[in-house]
């Protein structure tokens, strides 16, 4: 991948997330492209609402919100875990799966609930979904969308020190380990976010750079 494909106006992009784990992963993925990702919290932008039933709608809402409040191009990710035995849950509610009204979000609580919900399930298949939305302006009529899917299965016992979210319970048969046991640089080559980014950049190459008005 080469930064030569990118419009100079995309050298500094606001990341529409306050999730430290996502910031680490995306910064590592975008650094080789010469793109500086600035978390929206550094620019005084609050988190956008995520009222939609699909990942793509939530990603677009967050990207437009960040661009509106900063005047910068914005990248948003909406991602989550979908479990076959749970009918696709936790899905778009992955980050707040076990959150109580007025309570804080907790990876540990989310994972504990997931394991309980699957206690009697024989089918442990699951997949991570990542939707990336890049808008050059708030009202960009042609946002760039990238989608990535990462298939695995849920295990009861957590393993691994890397990653975040459901990674310690997300087992990858082809790798022989959980996502949390992968070295970060390896995960960043094969994860759902890496796949979504590759697709987004392919679209950017195809459309060419578009100047901000």
Swiss-Prot record:
Keyword Nucleotide-binding: yes or no? yes
Cite the InterPro entries for this sequence. dITP/XTP_pyrophosphatase (IPR020922), ITPase-like_fam (IPR029001), RdgB/HAM1 (IPR002637)
Question: What EC number(s) does this enzyme carry?
Answer: 3.6.1.66
Which top-rank group of organisms is this from? Bacteria
Which residues belong to the signal peptide in this entry?
Answer: none
Q: Where, in this chain's numbering, is Mg(2+) bound? A: 78
Q: Which molecular function terms from Gene Ontology are attached?
A: dITP diphosphatase activity; ITP diphosphatase activity; metal ion binding; nucleotide binding; ribonucleoside triphosphate phosphatase activity; XTP diphosphatase activity
- Can the keyword Magnesium be found in this entry's annotation? yes
Q: Which reaction does it catalyse?
A: XTP + H2O = XMP + diphosphate + H(+); dITP + H2O = dIMP + diphosphate + H(+); ITP + H2O = IMP + diphosphate + H(+)
Which residues are annotated as active site?
Answer: 78 (proton acceptor)
Q: Which UniProt keywords apply?
A: Hydrolase, Magnesium, Metal-binding, Nucleotide metabolism, Nucleotide-binding
What are its GO cellular component terms?
A: cytosol
Gene3D superfamilies in alphabetical order = 3.90.950.10
UniProt remark on cofactor binding:
Binds 1 Mg(2+) ion per subunit.
PANTHER family, per the entry: INOSINE TRIPHOSPHATE PYROPHOSPHATASE, INOSINE TRIPHOSPHATE PYROPHOSPHATASE/HAM1 PROTEIN
- Similarity annotation: Belongs to the HAM1 NTPase family.
Q: Which NCBIfam families match?
A: RdgB/HAM1 family non-canonical purine NTP pyrophosphatase
Query: HAMAP family given for it?
Result: Non_canon_purine_NTPase (MF_01405)
Function (record text):
Pyrophosphatase that catalyzes the hydrolysis of nucleoside triphosphates to their monophosphate derivatives, with a high preference for the non-canonical purine nucleotides XTP (xanthosine triphosphate), dITP (deoxyinosine triphosphate) and ITP. Seems to function as a house-cleaning enzyme that removes non-canonical purine nucleotides from the nucleotide pool, thus preventing their incorporation into DNA/RNA and avoiding chromosomal lesions.
Q: What is this protein called?
A: dITP/XTP pyrophosphatase
Taxonomy of the source species? Bacteria, Pseudomonadati, Pseudomonadota, Betaproteobacteria, Burkholderiales
